[in-house]
Amino acid sequence: MKTLLLTLVVVTIVCLDLGYTLKCNKLIPIASKTCTAGKNLCYKMFMMSDLTIPVKRGCIDVCPKNSLLVKYVCCNTDRCN
C-alpha cells in the first residue's frame, strides 16, 4: 500500500511538472530572471543597424515579428538568450 501511494505521488509530480519555470537572461547575460506564468519564451532584440549587440532581453509569451528596424530571436530553454 505504501509503495502504491509513493508511486502515485511520484507520477503526479512528474506529470504536473510542479515548480518548473523558465529562466531568461536580462540585458546583461550574467543576470537572469524567472519568467512569470504564460511567458514561455526567452528573446533577444537587435536593432537591424547593428545585429551584433542585443538591445533588450527577457521573457515573452509570443515571439514578435521582425520589422525593418528591429530583429527578434526567440528560444525556449533556460538562459538561451
From Swiss-Prot:
Protein source organism: Naja atra (Chinese cobra)
CDD domains per UniProt: TFP_snake_toxin (cd00206)
Name listed for the protein in its UniProt record: Cytotoxin I-like T-15
Pfam families noted in UniProt: Toxin_cobra-type (PF21947)
InterPro entries linked to this entry: Cytotoxin_Cobra, Snake_3FTx, Snake_toxin-like_sf, Snake_toxin_con_site, Toxin_cobra-type
Function: Shows cytolytic activity on many different cells by forming pore in lipid membranes. In vivo, increases heart rate or kills the animal by cardiac arrest. In addition, it binds to heparin with high affinity, interacts with Kv channel-interacting protein 1 (KCNIP1) in a calcium-independent manner, and binds to integrin alpha-V/beta-3 (ITGAV/ITGB3) with moderate affinity.
Predominant cellular place of this UniProt entry's protein: secreted
GO cellular component: extracellular region; membrane; other organism cell membrane
Highest rank taxon of the organism: Eukaryota
Signal peptide range in chain numbering: 1-21
GO MF, any single term: toxin activity
GO biological process terms held by the UniProt record: killing of cells of another organism
UniProt-listed PROSITE patterns: SNAKE_TOXIN
